[in-house]
Amino acid sequence: MEMVVLVDHAGDPIGVQSKADVHGQSTPRHLAFSCHVVDEQGRLLVTRRALKKRTWPGVWTNSFCGHPAPGETLEDAVSRRAEFELGLSIDHITCAIPNFSYVARDASGIEENEHCPVFIARAVSSLTPNPAEVAEAQWTSSSELKSAIDAAPWAFSPWLVEHFTELQPLIAEHIVEAEDDD
């Protein structure tokens, strides 16, 4: 059974609960993460959530999201989910927005209530999306993504809409840092 870490409003752990039980009409705050993957050309990977996903099925979002297991570091969880959702190896995993949190309710009434640090990572392998997680994947520029979010925010996950303006200038910095490390 997959477990998630419950957190207080500061993001500090206060317990655990099964993932299956945590998401509902009144979801307790729990730890999650979002990750944006960039390629060697500086493009961002956006994905459309699989239609069978329990929350926000079919919406476009960042590259992937997930929940760290109890005792798992966020960086290890990011690597694990990149492989699981996208069949992708990543490096240069950087926490760009450590204190991002949001609460949102999808059309089915399920509430998300997440302390959700936002990461940027670099793709180092080819993409093989898991169809149970990802309906579509597309590489795009950050400016094209920002324009699309501004034009049709309803087509994107609420967490992406909420954090992307803060994240956008950090993407270019991450690309330069990754290149400098090589």
UniProtKB/Swiss-Prot annotation:
Compartment(s) of residence: Cytoplasm
Pfam families: NUDIX (PF00293)
Keywords: Cytoplasm, Isomerase, Isoprene biosynthesis, Magnesium, Manganese, Metal-binding
Entry binding sites for Mg(2+): 65, 85
Keyword Iron-sulfur tagged: no
InterPro entries: Idi_bact, IsopentenylPP_isomerase_typ1, NUDIX_hydrolase-like_dom_sf, NUDIX_hydrolase_dom
Residues annotated as domain Nudix hydrolase: 28-162
EC class (word): isomerase
Record text on cofactor binding: Binds 1 Mg(2+) ion per subunit. The magnesium ion binds only when substrate is bound.
Residue sites binding Mn(2+) per the record: 23, 30, 67, 112, 114
GO biological process, one term: isoprenoid biosynthetic process
UniProt KW Manganese keyword: yes
Catalysed reaction equations from the record: isopentenyl diphosphate = dimethylallyl diphosphate
Family note: Belongs to the IPP isomerase type 1 family.
HAMAP family referenced in this protein's UniProt entry, alphabetically: Idi (MF_00202)
Protein name as catalogued: Isopentenyl-diphosphate Delta-isomerase
Species: Brevibacterium linens
Gene coding for it: idi
